[in-house]
């Protein structure tokens, strides 16, 4: 069975500097603990970049204000 992005509850996205479009989907994750760890690693590895952790349309955390 092949999985699709809809099979995962969480995603980590890298946004452009204008916060208008997603430049890269960093990860699709099904487990919250793994999603939080992946988000923390993404923020640490890309300082100053706009990164979000989302559960479907809901933003759980973001690396910018």
Where are these regions (language model features)?
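Short aromatic-glycine-(Arg/Gly/Cys) micro-motifs in beta-strand/loop hairpins
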Residues: 1-23
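Charged, amphipathic alpha-helical segments
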Residues: 1, 30-41
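Short, mixed-charge low-complexity intrinsically disordered segments
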Residues: 45-65
């Amino acid at each position: 069975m092949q999985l699709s992005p809809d099979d995962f509850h969480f995603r980590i996205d890298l946004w452009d500097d204008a916060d208008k479009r997603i430049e890269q989907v960093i990860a699709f994750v099904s487990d919250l603990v793994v999603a939080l760890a992946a988000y923390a690693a993404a923020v640490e590895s890309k300082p100053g970049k706009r990164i979000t952790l989302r559960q479907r349309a809901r933003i759980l955390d973001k690396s910018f204000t």
